Regions:
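Intrinsic low-complexity, intrinsically disordered segments enriched in polar/basic residues
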Residues: 1-2, 53
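Bacterial N-terminal signal peptides that target proteins for export
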Residues: 2-10
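Intrinsically disordered, low-complexity terminal tails/loops enriched in metal-binding residues
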Residues: 14-131
């Protein structure tokens, strides 16, 4: 059987490109989840300024959060970000998807101790780890 070096080279290049794209995606996911985590922590603490700063760190994804004028607006923007955070978090170790049954909202956090970003300090422990 003759080896076709062009075919082998093409397969090798495609494999290398796939690995490179996966690494880039993973780095982007980590950056997103890090900034998202800062927003989560700020909202748990009812810190609008910290949430807005985290929104800026999120780039275009965090535009609504960075422009929020109230904690309610920030939490609404964070809810949209949470929808986006669930998928990359599933592929990263140390991230957990949590759910608040009273508000019917999900979020991603790094701790297994519930820290609900949606209900303010009065609802900080409302929720459960889903994944």
């Amino acid at each position: 059987m003759k080896l076709n070096y062009k075919t082998i080279l093409a397969v090798f290049a495609a494999t290398a490109l796939t690995v490179s794209l996966q690494a880039a995606s993973s780095d982007q996911d980590k950056q997103f989840l890090t900034a998202y985590g800062k927003a989560h922590d700020a909202l748990v603490a009812d810190d609008l300024g910290g949430a807005k700063k985290a929104g800026t760190d999120l780039g275009p994804d965090g535009a609504d959060l960075s422009k929020s004028k109230s904690l309610d607006e920030a939490r609404a923007a964070f809810d949209k970000l949470s929808d986006k955070a669930v998928k990359p978090a599933a592929g990263q170790s140390g991230y957990h998807v949590a759910h608040c049954p009273m508000l019917n909202k999900d979020w991603v956090q790094t701790s297994t101790t519930i820290a609900n970003p949606y209900g303010g300090k009065g609802m900080i422990s409302c929720g459960e780890i889903k994944k």
